[in-house]
Amino acid sequence: MRLIILNLLSLGITPSVVGHSGPHRQETQNLNNFLESNAINPAAINGETRHTGGVHLACAILEASNQTAVVFPSDGELYTQIDKAHASATAPKNPACIYTPNDVKGVSLGVKVATFVQAKFAIRSGGHSPMEYFANIDGGVLISLAGIKTLEYNADTQTQRSGFGNLWQDVYRHVNAQGRTVVGGRTGSVGLALTLGGGLSHFSNAYGWAAQNVLSYEMVLADGSIVIASEEENSDLYFAVKAGANNFGIVTHIVQRTYPLGKIWGGSMIFPGNASAQFMAALADYQAKGQLDKKSAILPYVGLIADAVVAQFSYLEPVERPEAFEAFYDIPVIQDLTQVWDTFAAMVTAPIPYNMTRFSYATTDLLYDKEAYLEIERICHKYIPRMRKLEGGDIMLMPQPISVSMVGEARARGSDPMGVADQPQLWFVVSSGWNLAQDDAEAESIMLDALAEVEEYTKSRALHLPFYFLNDAFSTQMPLQSYGAVTYGKLQAASRKYDPTRVFQELVPGGFKLV
């Protein structure tokens, strides 16, 4: 608290402590000064709200600043609609209010208000994460970035500036119209916060991780200041935010490199579930040979109970059934939805025929080994009987082959905080899906038990790698620490420098924290 007070004093603001024994004259003046310094009429905040303080005062101040930007539970369906704008039904909570600013100054105000009254808050971009409290909060302020919709292509620099209220499909549509693309999400419905966790893309084989193709981040820091983080400005912050999640501030915009792109081939193939072992063998063969073609990429979903394997293929030229994927062509196909697409945006917005009401996931990393790929698939099959007991229960595997070229292309574009080993490897995700909230704990337990047995096996064969991809990590995993002691120390140093009062460690409870 002392550090918070010192920080506010440095801003010329004396913190209010309303809500303890009634508003005293000095406390009232402190609050009035804060309101006036932010162009808010003190008369807009009534005495009862001043006395209550905390999150209720924060919501009232934000409403006074922009009435249309704040939604309360009393707003009924509108509140529910915004609150539940998440990919998984595990994520919505019950925030005291939802604040949706439409520009970076509004985001800055949200942070300053929450800090001044010491109200806990969450930040939501696309809302893709299923983890509790990562992008929502109970009884605090939810700052939604849905109003930050900037889309600007600079033809002179061939760069794209995008607001964090966009989804990747919005960015792709905008930049594809220029005959260009960015390195972004593999499905169009994912948000831009993917670039705060490295970011795996269909373009990674050619250009590295998504974050390594971000030239600058526009951020709001804990004191409300707006800064640019890039190689030239605040380079230590730039390094940290590329894979450090929400520990340093709120990112509102990114500027990305773009690359030329015309028509492409890709889409989904659906294979029968009883071909899952054959698919894993083909995946290993693809990684050994086909993935050497940097234009190729694959995103597999192996549903063990849904009895289907769905693979999304991508090839960065309009070549029908490219040779890179020949390992998969001998597997029986239920449905082939691949085609030549006019734009990448059209492909990633096509629905993937796999959906779960409630889901979660956890990740592990292992070195390339065909025998191991087959064995970890067999291990996960053992957990089917437990999952079948849950309504809508399924176990889905996402075996993501990582090539040496992905690592090399990422490093070629600057310092990579993730420190991924330059060896062929598999980022292996075990995901659980189910229907009922009452089954949350059991569904996650099954998933984690399966993953633990997978790791026990890979460690026994000296294949385990101690890296956890943040964007696929479960809430109890420790991806930040998995970057190694040197990088983790740099993240901690950046946090101390840019958030000395620990706002994003203590007032923002969600996400992977620095300890």
Swiss-Prot record:
Domain FAD-binding PCMH-type: start-end pairs? 91-261
Which EC numbers characterise this protein's activity in its record?
Answer: 1.1.3.42, 5.5.1.20
Question: What pathway is it annotated to?
Answer: Phytotoxin biosynthesis
UniProt keyword rRNA processing present: no
GO function term, MF aspect, one: oxidoreductase activity
Reply yes or no: does the keyword Isomerase apply: yes
What exactly does this protein do?
Bifunctional solanapyrone synthase; part of the gene cluster that mediates the biosynthesis of the phytotoxin solanapyrone, a causal agent of early blight disease of potato and tomato. The prosolanapyrone synthase sol1 is a polyketide synthase that produces the octaketide desmethylprosolanapyrone I via sequential condensations of 7 malonyl-CoA units with one acetyl-CoA unit, and one methylation step. The octaketide backbone is further methylated by the sol2 O-methyltransferase to yield prosolanapyrone I.
Q: What is this protein called?
A: Bifunctional solanapyrone synthase
